[in-house]
Amino acid sequence: MAYVTVGTENSTDIELYYEDHGFGRPVVLIAGYVQDGSSWEKQTAALLDAGNRVITYDRRGFGKSSQPTTGHDYDTYAADLNSLFTKLDLRDTVLVGFSMGTGEVARFIGRYGSQRVAKAVFIGSLQPFMLKSEETPDGVPQEDVDSMLDAIRADRYAFFTSFFENFYNLDENLGSRISEEAVRASWQVAASSSAYASVWAPAAWYTDFRADIDKIDVPTLIMHGTGDRNVPIDLTSRQFAKALPSATYIEIEGAPHGMLWTHGEEINKALLDFLA
């Protein structure tokens, strides 16, 4: 098992678990909330078959990584990613983020530049800025964010159950595009996450990424499902595509937020076409 040390909390090292497979151009896959590198299994297989080197890692607080009570913000998440880049001496890299992982992609480029990044991919994006403000009147009100965080604190396991119902649009896709066993596996990974990170990672979703978008200067792919109930497309990717008109923008009709699994074939085709 491979780890990169990204800091310390008191007497304990903070270590991120990662996997590094295959050969060719490196593709770094960054998972969403309460998920880990295994959430990319359908994409990992397709990317390896196409001759790529595929690197996944678990965000601090999740998966097999350390569970600190510090650093649950995008400046730190981007610094963690930079530590992985440094350890593996990554260059000419394709950065691919899903959901919460799109924040690392945006903030990494915004903070560290694109010298080591060849292309960027945003799937189910949080960008540009989801929180309601004078400039974003259609955003999510702070009181709704606070209510969500309170629900996680009260019973995160019950929250995960309702979260995945909308993550996969189970009323539409259970038994056809996703099995009960796959949903259960997602829940089990979520349940293994840090109780602290389970609360504070979602607070970071409402980071303002508009300044980071201004610094994206590499070929970029933005993908989003029109059926996304967790991260509404009108508030995020459609606005993101307007803010970054040079990007390739793809909407996947009817796809839920958890489309890496439910619409894996469509995601893989778009991803491989973009990487070609």
Stretches found by the model and what they are:
Residues 216, 222-224, 228:
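Short beta-strand/loop motif that positions the catalytic acidic residue
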Residues 7-11, 49, 55-100, 109-111, ...:
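Active-site loop/oxyanion-hole signature of alpha/beta-hydrolase fold enzymes
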Residues 226-229, 254-256:
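Acidic beta-to-alpha connecting loop that harbors the catalytic carboxylate
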Residues 106-111, 115-154:
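Flexible "cap/lid" loop of the alpha/beta hydrolase fold
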Residues 128-139, 150-214:
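Conserved alpha/beta-hydrolase catalytic His-Asp/Glu region
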